[in-house]
Amino acid sequence: MQLNMLKGKLHQARVTQTELEYEGSCAIDLDLLEAVGIHEYEQIHVYNIENGERFVTYAIIGERGSRMISMNGAAAHKCNEGDRVIICAYAGVPESELGEFQPRLAYLDADNRITQRRGSIPLQVA
């Protein structure tokens, strides 16, 4: 059996621009894409921390080193510049490989610089 598992996550990325008329859905700095293993045209899920919007789109390459997170086309209606978002990609992982599977997680500051990388999410305690 294959399970859909979190593959890569950009946590608390800041939307740097919105382009309603631009072709493509979410342009992300290539350095950030590579950090979490998200590929060009790969399906991504975007969770807007500011307004609760959750939507599915796809990633396109943004200029390397720009720290760009640009919501384009219809996705531009879901976010404003400066909004904090979580961007996730998922992958099918065979149940037999779950023991060695780890997601690639990157935590960002307000300027979309990576401040921390992890392979797991800490245990939440009561």
Swiss-Prot record:
Keywords: Autocatalytic cleavage, Cytoplasm, Decarboxylase, Lyase, Pantothenate biosynthesis, Pyruvate, Schiff base, Zymogen. Catalyzes the pyruvoyl-dependent decarboxylation of aspartate to produce beta-alanine. The modification Pyruvic acid (Ser) is found at S25. GO terms for biological process: alanine biosynthetic process; pantothenate biosynthetic process. GO terms for cellular component: cytosol. Heterooctamer of four alpha and four beta subunits. Binds 1 pyruvoyl group covalently per subunit. The active site is at S25, Y58. It comes from Halorhodospira halophila (strain DSM 244 / SL1) (Ectothiorhodospira halophila (strain DSM 244 / SL1)). Belongs to the PanD family. Its EC number is 4.1.1.11. Gene3D superfamilies: 2.40.40.20. Substrate binds at T57, G73, A74, A75. InterPro entries: Asp_de-COase-like_dom_sf, Asp_decarbox. The gene is panD. It catalyses: L-aspartate + H(+) = beta-alanine + CO2. It comes from the Bacteria. GO terms for molecular function: aspartate 1-decarboxylase activity. Is synthesized initially as an inactive proenzyme, which is activated by self-cleavage at a specific serine bond to produce a beta-subunit with a hydroxyl group at its C-terminus and an alpha-subunit with a pyruvoyl group at its N-terminus. Coiled coil: none annotated. This is Aspartate 1-decarboxylase. Pathway: Cofactor biosynthesis; (R)-pantothenate biosynthesis; beta-alanine from L-aspartate: step 1/1. It is an enzyme of class 4 (lyase). Its cofactor is pyruvate.
